């Protein structure tokens, strides 16, 4: 009896192991499947491919603003670690699907691709060395991860750096 139960249990587990399809590990992002797709369809989470990136984003003392401009979007970033350790800058952001190409105006060579995840913007963990010129002391923009607080252009346009300069404008 115990043996028959063990065999039946193994067969049930084997049936739960998936359909035999291999996961796409080529680096190409496919359409969301399973739970994520169901959540997007139900409206529980926003579809990053169809969401506007405009808004004010934050986490703790990290702030990002994104506003539309004539040709793309303007982005402003301010990160404050205290003790005069901060980063700040403005630039241009262009979007292709879930990828955001960020270029800071003040610094040649400070451009990189970030991710847009519906209501979050995530910078890569490693940025070009030139981006460190936007920062004082040991502060860094690498790995910045912020969530949207507001979709309002007027709120996003009010973000300032540590010296009181506006980082985003509402257009060119």
Report each predicted region and the residues it spans.
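Sec-dependent signal peptide recognition
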Residues: 2-7
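A composition-driven surface/loop motif
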Residues: 30, 55-58, 73-74, 102-106, ...
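Bacterial signal peptide processing site
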Residues: 17-19
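C-terminal motif of bacterial Sec signal peptides marking the signal peptidase cleavage site
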Residues: 13-15
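N-terminal glycine/threonine-rich, aromatic-flanked beta-hairpin/loop signature
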Residues: 62-99
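Tryptophan-anchored aromatic micro-motifs
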Residues: 27-65, 125, 145-171
């Amino acid at each position: 009896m115990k043996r028959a139960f063990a065999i039946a249990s193994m067969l049930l587990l084997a049936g739960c192991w998936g359909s035999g399809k291999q996961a796409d590990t080529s680096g190409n992002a496919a359409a969301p499947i399973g739970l994520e797709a169901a959540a997007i369809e139900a409206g529980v989470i926003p579809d990053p491919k169809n969401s506007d990136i405009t808004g004010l984003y934050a986490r703790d003392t990290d702030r990002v603003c994104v506003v539309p401009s004539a040709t793309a979007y303007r982005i402003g970033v301010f990160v404050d670690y205290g003790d005069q350790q901060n980063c700040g800058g403005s630039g241009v952001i262009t979007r292709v699907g879930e990828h955001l190409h960020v270029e800071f105006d003040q610094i040649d060579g400070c451009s990189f691709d970030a991710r847009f995840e519906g209501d979050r913007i995530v910078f890569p963990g490693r940025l070009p060395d030139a981006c460190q010129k936007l920062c004082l002391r040991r502060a860094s923009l690498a790995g910045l991860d912020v969530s949207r607080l507001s979709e309002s252009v007027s709120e996003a346009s009010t973000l300032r750096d540590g010296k009181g300069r506006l980082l985003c404008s509402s257009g060119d």
